[in-house]
Amino acid sequence: MSSSRAMQRLCGLMRKAVQDYEMIAPGDKVMVGVSGGKDSVALTIGLAELRKYIGFDFTVQAVTLDPQFGGRPMDYTVLQELFAQYDIPYEIRRTEIGPVVFDCRKEKNPCALCAKLRRGALHTAAQELGCNKVALGHHLDDAVETFYMNLWREGRIGCFSPVTYLSRRDLTLIRPMLLATEQA
């Protein structure tokens, strides 16, 4: 499948999810946390494309939280140039997540702490930028994996929701790629 056809398919699935689960409303300001991986980049571009034909206006704001692993900032020039082509405002926020996790706390299993710190920084960035929604790049494969991990590790049936309201932050998390598989 060509990349343009793949993007059309992804946008169609995103549109269905957005409409079926009422993820985005007119005037919403949606922030996407961009790691630089394929899921977050596809989500950001997909949302920008979706603005063209969804039938109402909403804003997309891309943000990268640079964890500064190794104590050094990363170069995000490629993402800056890509998002400029789609008229997507893009901000890079340097954080101390890497040094805190590895130098201060010296975690043996740093993933949980790193994820918690990133979530907090992401929610703070959304609030500071005046965003009312945070779009996450979880897709159908992630939902299936989460379902089975909960079943096997915790003995319970459960998964994340397409839309989650965080009352303490007054933010809504949305997962527009939920109907798409990783191959979609």
Regions found by a protein language model. Give the residues of each.
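ATP-dependent adenylation/nucleotidyltransferase module used to activate substrates
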Residues: 2-149, 153-163, 183
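Short, flexible loop segments at boundaries between secondary-structure elements
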Residues: 159-183
